């Protein structure tokens, strides 16, 4: 068995491509091995795939030296034209013998094919040298790799995320010769970063030699090993000055992707900058300089220190002079950025909130949707309506402000007035920070700066928090953050409804993978809040309210737009349900109903169906539902029935049973008590079966037939309040 080493060296790769390379290369190389070498590596025991910011590496051990010999059957001409009348070979057979260099024509035999019998001959195909196969196929393997973005850098028809500078390819220590573009494979690797590119090539003998030389240079090939090393060094260096660092997986993963020789360097900045909001300081350090801010271990207060990760060749010895030079350089660059942030912050706080609100009149939300000021005006009407729909009962209103006791009517009215004032103030300030200098320069801080400035300008904590949280849900350090209270909820829900419905009006909902205006994300966030906070609200009511109050000057096909909106919401909802591991049939039985409306209610139904699908009553209801559906399937939507025509005892029994469950079901539906609803609906099973056993539905008399179908359709419609049982699979 042999070994194969491939290293593709390039310019600095985008960090997001580094972690994606190993699985892509693994898939491509495994396919090649299976197809060309008959060498399967399903368990990944022989091949290893690595990547850093400058190199992509494939190491294969226990690889076959050559492919095995194979027996192959060669099909010749039809047997009927192979021989002359005297039995001697005819011209077609002679040509077949010459073409395949057959020495002994007695080994030719007949084989049956679809079109008759043919001459055939078995031969041995000699195995090929694996090195030769590799040299022929490696360029194609590289070319098949998929990237988010790639580039041309020579006249050759090749693409790669960055220009390829060298290719190392060895099979048992020998060069596997091939060209990729204008780069020729050899036995050299570029390791050191101290010298010029041309002077720092190192000759490689084999895999062990390669690994040893990388290790000596401090290069960590494995992404996970590099990540663990960086995290460990961050913790140790922070401890030295009694600090901790904020665990930011996104930043760490980015650092892993841009380094191969990670080296930790501490730095510090002037304490005068600590008056700047710490969120702004942290953003400048993390997003713009890729530094890790440090916090006091005892109280988590931001300290004037940071840690940077340099990508330098290590001599495995501590070089204090070098580290000091790097640290001073880091501090100098950071100081320039912090001076900018300090200037923007000081300019902002000279103004008032009203100044920034007025400036939103000049910021366009989107062409055809007005400015952010106009968006805010829409939200001022929409938010109270949503609040009333969600918290319209006394119990909900009293929970909106926990300090208010609503035992009597006057206190309830007082609570409502206070809630509405808070909502109005929250909505008025949601977008003011978009016009600040800081958010203009650091757009990632929208909402965060709004909260900070609102507090500074004397707004209540509830209002300030809602400004930040109306952008929620959002991920932070691997955790999903939701609004903390109902005012944040209403602010987020209202803003997202307005965004989605505005783009519905423009007929600009995202298609395919593209979502440039984050409409899909807004709908998903809206659904997640409704599910997390257990809010029931009618999508149809929101749509109707919205277009009855806004965009009335436009000629709109509201029926079509509503269908588009409901389908868009339903698709996002179904995807979320799938991510929660509900079965597709369970989801479809609820979400595919034409009356799909309330997100949280639909979730409760799906959850109930999932947990009770195997219940005996659900079996019975499914059987009855499908029986009803089979009879009425082609009858249209008739739901009217004439009681005077339905006089058979089975019909009378079924009508009474239907009217009983219809009258009783409303209270269980209102309480979302689907277990009792199932028990109630089960009472219709026996009457339906008795009806089908004794009554013919499709009789010749049209009025009688339609009345019976109308009764059955009415029962189907009632049962759909639980789910569409016909969608369930057993």
Residue spans for each PLM region:
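Amphipathic alpha-helical "coupling" segments that flank catalytic cores
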Residues: 1-397, 405-730
């Amino acid at each position: 068995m042999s070994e194969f080493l491939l290293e593709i060296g390039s310019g600095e790769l985008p960090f997001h491509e580094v972690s994606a390379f190993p699985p892509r290369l693994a898939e491509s190389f495994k396919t090649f091995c299976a197809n060309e070498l008959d060498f399967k590596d399903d368990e990944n025991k022989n091949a290893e795939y690595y990547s850093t910011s400058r190199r992509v590496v494939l190491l294969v051990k226990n690889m076959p030296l050559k492919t095995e010999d194979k027996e192959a059957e060669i099909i010749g001409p039809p047997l009927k034209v192979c021989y002359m009348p005297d039995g001697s070979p005819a011209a077609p057979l002679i040509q077949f013998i010459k073409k395949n260099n057959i020495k002994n024509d007695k080994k030719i035999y007949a084989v049956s094919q679809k079109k008759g019998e043919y001459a055939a001959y078995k031969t041995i195909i000699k195995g090929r040298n694996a090195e030769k196969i590799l040299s022929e196929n490696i360029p194609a393997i590289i070319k098949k790799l998929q990237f988010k973005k790639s580039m041309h850098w020579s006249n050759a028809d090749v693409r790669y995320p960055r220009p390829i500078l060298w290719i190392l390819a060895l099979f048992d220590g020998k060069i596997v010769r091939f060209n990729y573009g204008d780069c020729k494979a050899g036995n050299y690797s570029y390791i050191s970063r101290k010298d010029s590119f041309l002077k720092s090539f190192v000759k490689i003998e084999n895999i062990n030699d390669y690994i040893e030389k990388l290790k000596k240079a401090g290069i960590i090939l494995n992404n996970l090993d590099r990540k663990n090393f960086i995290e460990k060094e961050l913790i140790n260096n922070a401890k030295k000055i009694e600090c901790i660092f904020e665990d930011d997986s996104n930043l760490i993963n980015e650092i892993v992707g841009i380094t191969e020789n990670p080296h930790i360097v501490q730095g510090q900045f002037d304490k005068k900058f600590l008056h700047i909001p710490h969120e702004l300081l942290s953003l400048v350090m993390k997003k713009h300089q890729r530094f890790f801010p440090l916090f006091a271990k005892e109280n988590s207060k931001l300290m004037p220190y940071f840690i940077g990760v340099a990508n330098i060749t290590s001599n495995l010895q501590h070089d204090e002079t070098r580290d000091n030079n790097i640290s001073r350089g880091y501090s100098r660059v950071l100081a320039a950025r912090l001076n900018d942030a300090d200037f923007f912050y000081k300019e902002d706080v000279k103004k008032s909130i009203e100044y920034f609100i007025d400036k939103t009149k000049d910021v366009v939300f989107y062409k055809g949707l007005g400015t952010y000021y106009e968006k805010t005006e829409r939200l001022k009407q929409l938010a109270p309506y949503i609040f009333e729909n969600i918290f319209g009962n006394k119990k909900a209103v009293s929970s909106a402000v926990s300090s208010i006791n609503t035992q009597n009517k006057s206190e309830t009215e007082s609570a409502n007035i206070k809630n509405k004032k808070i909502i109005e103030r929250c909505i008025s300030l949601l977008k003011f920070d978009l016009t600040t200098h800081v958010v203009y320069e650091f757009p990632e801080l929208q909402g965060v700066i709004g909260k900070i400035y609102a507090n500074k300008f004397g707004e209540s904590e509830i209002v300030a928090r809602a400004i930040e949280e109306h952008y929620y849900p959002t991920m932070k350090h691997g955790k999903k953050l939701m609004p903390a209270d109902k005012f944040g909820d209403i602010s987020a829900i209202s803003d997202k409804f307005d965004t989605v419905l505005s783009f519905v009006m423009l007929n600009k909902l995202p298609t395919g993978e593209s979502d440039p205006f984050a409409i899909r994300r807004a709908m998903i966030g809206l659904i997640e809040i409704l599910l997390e906070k257990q809010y029931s609200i009618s999508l149809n009511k929101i749509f109707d309210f919205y277009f009855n109050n806004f965009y009335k000057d436009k000629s709109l096909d509201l029926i079509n737009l509503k269908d588009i909106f409901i389908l868009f919401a339903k698709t996002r909802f179904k995807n979320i349900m799938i991510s929660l591991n509900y079965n597709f049939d369970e989801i479809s039985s609820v979400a595919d109903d034409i009356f799909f409306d309330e997100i949280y209610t639909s979730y409760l139904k799906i959850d109930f169906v999932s947990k009770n699908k195997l219940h005996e009553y659900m079996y019975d209801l499914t059987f009855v539902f499908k029986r009803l559906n089979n009879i009425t399937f082609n009858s249209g939507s008739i739901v009217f029935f004439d009681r005077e025509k339905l006089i058979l005892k089975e019909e009378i029994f079924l009508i009474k049973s239907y009217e009983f469950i219809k009258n009783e079901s409303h209270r269980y539906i209102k309480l979302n008590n689907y277990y009792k609803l199932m028990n109630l609906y089960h009472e219709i099973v026996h009457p339906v079966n008795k009806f089908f056993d004794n009554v013919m539905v499709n009789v010749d008399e049209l009025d009688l037939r339609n009345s019976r179908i109308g009764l059955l359709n009415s029962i189907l419609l009632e049962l759909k309040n639980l789910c569409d049982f016909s969608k369930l699979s057993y």
